Amino acid sequence: RRIMGDTIVPTIPIMVNTYYPPNQPTLNRCYELGRQIRAAVEALPGDARVGVIASGGLSHFVVDEEIDGITMKALREKDREALTSMPRERLNSGTSEIRNWIAMAGATEHLDHEWSDYVPSYRSKAGTGCGMGFGIWS
């Protein structure tokens, strides 16, 4: 509200079961979901400006800078193969939310990467915390 005031922004939340087996989607299915979201947006009448937001962390509850780095590099380079071939066993617990980023990659594959950053945010000496990714495609 601080930025938008009372402006109402139409929003369609799409929830992906990243966390609970046995029906977590495959990484390829997440990418395809993103492509279908893009197709639906492109089919809208008019010239509405649409934002796609992936929520969720990269790695957490234990920070995994390696898998976060693979993800961020693949997002920057539009490397679908790298995004969809990550080992599923690495995408457990909170790290499973990388699936949301993969869906976003499918929706934005036609856009140019402008900026991204990664901050590994540790909260304990045991390595717990969250890998925080940020990016802009337009």
Model-derived segments and spans:
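Flexible, D/E/H-enriched segments
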Residues: 1-35, 40-43, 63-138
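Beta-strand elements within well-structured catalytic alpha/beta cores of enzymes
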Residues: 14, 48-56
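Phosphate/ribose-phosphate-bearing ligand recognition and processing surfaces
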Residues: 57-61
